[in-house]
């Protein structure tokens, strides 16, 4: 097994930080007091939301979203001689050394386990003994990248789905319910990002509980007036009963999703707004039912730990749908800082804090991947990643509505070859264990700065300025990468490294 000496340097920097002596065993600030309950929970103190440690001290979580994945196999081989236990323990220490004080994704990232490489039981055991705060995954739903060709979304209204959720929860929660290092539970990453597919998958199943439930919602929304529905959807049903019994489809087009995410305008056809509103109401029915089933299953075994729900794309749910799931979550968990759907109104409406659950800060891919495949979040250089990280660290840590952030990052360069997203996502270390020292050292400083910013929350106007600076910078990088890709596609003989 290779030794990674850079960690010793990083750890020394952290130990010498001005905050080190002020922290309790969990990483909470001993001079900012909340209620001592014996478990992580949330409180609003002097206008700022905090996590509160089991000892009753304020905590703000900084993590990386994807430290333990199945696409780290090369690093396990080259750095840890194939020893998964050494890799798991070493990864926790490397995260600590970089200034990450918790693991929001837990012992493994469910959406990046397609290869079945990670020994999940071993990972759970290592994390139980690691004494680092973490959130445990209860993956009741899949990310779209986990879906195999032809696989449909589950009918969440079926008895089969309820039994699956109850079984999954019963396998894990009873043994975790008294663990003080567990902050809570989450249900997986981004299942609602493809909401149109969810609606169409459930409606097309004839005689299914999901179809019956969703068509019933539509019948109530149109007050039983089938002609009104026909006018919106361009159909010719004689009655809602005919619609239900025929097996015929109401299909939701892709523009619904693209419009909600800010990528496309509202369609111009008559009835488009009504169709769009119908889609949001149906999605709300699906999401609320799913969260209620999962919440009730968890609370049968555990009354204390936090429930985060899914780590969802920030515009997946409108305000009304956030309100629908409010009773079943303790923390709001959008993935990104968003201009399309700012989360502040949700925090205010639910009177619950938020944390950013999978925040990208740019990825550096080999240029052949940028030109040949979809390489999400590409930026020219690792320096540009630091530019975005700095802007985000300021924006998020100075916002009193956030209790933490999970950066979309990996420890080691990913080595899977199926998709650019997986083969190209860069880590803080190469797959041979070589540190990217300027990146590592700078991120340590930024993570430390975030902890100092917590005592200096900004006003709404100041936060808007930071938010605008970040998004304007991100848009410029996107434009540069579009220009690069266009140039290279037009000039395939140009050589580059």
Listing of model-derived features with the role each one plays in the protein:
Residues 5-15:
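Bacterial N-terminal signal peptides
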Residues 21-86, 93-95:
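N-terminal carbohydrate-binding accessory modules
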Residues 54, 179-320:
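Polysaccharide-binding and catalytic clefts of secreted carbohydrate-active enzymes
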Residues 144-153, 263-278, 313, 350-392, ...:
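Active-site clefts of carbohydrate-active enzymes
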């Amino acid at each position: 097994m290779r030794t990674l000496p850079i960690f010793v340097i990083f750890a020394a920097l952290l130990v010498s930080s001005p905050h080190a002596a002020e922290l309790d065993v969990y990483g909470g600030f001993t001079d900012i007091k909340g209620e001592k309950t014996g478990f992580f929970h949330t409180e609003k103190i002097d206008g700022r939301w905090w996590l509160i440690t089991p000892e009753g001290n304020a905590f703000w979580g900084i993590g990386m979203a994807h430290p333990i994945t199945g696409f780290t196999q090369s690093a396990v081989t080259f750095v840890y001689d194939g020893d998964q236990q050494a890799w798991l323990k070493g990864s926790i220490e490397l995260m600590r050394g970089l200034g990450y004080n918790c693991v929001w994704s837990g012992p493994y990232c469910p959406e990046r386990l397609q290869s079945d490489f990670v020994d999940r039981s071993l990972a759970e055991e290592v994390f139980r003994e690691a004494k680092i705060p973490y959130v445990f995954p209860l993956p009741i739903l899949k990310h779209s990248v986990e879906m195999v060709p032809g696989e449909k979304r589950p009918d969440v209204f079926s008895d089969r789905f309820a039994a699956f959720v109850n079984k999954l929860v019963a396998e894990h929660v009873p043994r975790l319910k008294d663990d003080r290092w567990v902050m809570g539970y989450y249900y997986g990453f981004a299942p609602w990002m493809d909401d149109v597919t969810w609606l169409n998958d459930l409606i097309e199943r004839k005689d299914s509980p999901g179809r019956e439930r969703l068509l019933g919602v539509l019948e109530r929304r149109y007050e039983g007036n089938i002609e009104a529905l026909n006018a919106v959807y361009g159909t010719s049903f004689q009655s809602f009963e005919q619609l239900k019994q025929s097996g015929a489809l109401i299909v939701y087009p892709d523009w619904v999703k693209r419009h909600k995410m800010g990528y496309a305008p509202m369609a111009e056809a008559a009835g488009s707004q009504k169709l769009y509103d119908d889609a949001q109401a149906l999605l709300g029915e699906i999401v609320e039912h799913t969260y209620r089933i999962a919440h009730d299953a968890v609370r049968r075994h555990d009354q204390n730990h936090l429930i985060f729900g899914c780590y969802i794309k920030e515009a997946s749910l409108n305000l009304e749908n956030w309100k629908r799931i409010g009773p079943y979550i303790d923390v709001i968990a959008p993935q990104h800082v968003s201009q399309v759907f700012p989360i502040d109104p949700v925090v205010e409406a639910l009177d619950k804090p938020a944390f950013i659950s999978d925040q990208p800060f740019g990825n550096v891919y080999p240029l052949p991947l940028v030109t040949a495949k979809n390489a999400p979040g590409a930026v020219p250089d690792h320096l540009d990643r630091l530019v975005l990280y700095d802007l985000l660290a300021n924006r998020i840590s100075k916002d009193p509505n956030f209790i933490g952030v999970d950066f979309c990052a990996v420890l080691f360069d990913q080595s899977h070859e199926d998709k650019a997203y997986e083969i190209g996502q860069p880590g803080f270390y190469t797959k041979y264990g070589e540190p990217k020292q300027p990146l590592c050292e700078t991120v340590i400083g930024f993570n430390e700065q975030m902890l100092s910013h917590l005592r200096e929350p900004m006003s709404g106007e100041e936060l808007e300025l930071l938010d605008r600076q970040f998004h304007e910078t991100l848009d410029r990088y996107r434009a540069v990468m579009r220009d690069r890709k266009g140039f290279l596609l037009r000039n395939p003989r140009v050589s580059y490294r």
